[in-house]
Amino acid sequence: MNRPAPVEISYENMRFLITHNPTNATLNKFTEELKKYGVTTLVRVCDATYDKAPVEKEGIHVLDWPFDDGAPPPNQIVDDWLNLLKTKFREEPGCCVAVHCVAGLGRAPVLVALALIECGMKYEDAVQFIRQKRRGAFNSKQLLYLEKYRPKMRLRFRDTNGHCCVQ
């Protein structure tokens, strides 16, 4: 199956890598790709299809937060995701958080869009921003979820330059 290449989404002080899931056969290449982008945490939002031990051996923490394909994330995963980002980007400025689902077109982009929205971006702008790099991202159910999502501005803190930053 031909999968889209990983894409980096950078906004203000946040860096994300959206990617598809590897197999045990492609795990070495996948791990090298993560290291190239400086990934320290990988969030897996689909069922496990590979052994995470080799990834963790390379110093990349793997979190398993699966939710249904095509569906919006449950509230608990949204809370966990935003809390993770708040901590990561404060403690490791410049780090990159990777997130993957099966194809990297639905669940993973939704979580990145939520982070952008929580930082003050309008949902339409967040969708367009991600789709510029990840064509085909989001299905209609996910778009409706993002449209109705009401941010609590959990990632919106201003630094002295007026930039969104995580504190």
UniProtKB/Swiss-Prot annotation:
Residue stretch(es) of the prosequence: 165-167
GO molecular function: enzyme inhibitor activity; protein tyrosine phosphatase activity
Enzyme Commission (EC) number: 3.1.3.48
Record's catalysed reaction(s): O-phospho-L-tyrosyl-[protein] + H2O = L-tyrosyl-[protein] + phosphate
Subunit details: In contrast to PTP4A1 and PTP4A3, does not interact with tubulin. Interacts with RABGGTB.
Biological function: Protein tyrosine phosphatase which stimulates progression from G1 into S phase during mitosis. Promotes tumors. Inhibits geranylgeranyl transferase type II activity by blocking the association between RABGGTA and RABGGTB.
Name the UniProt record assigns to this protein: Protein tyrosine phosphatase type IVA 2
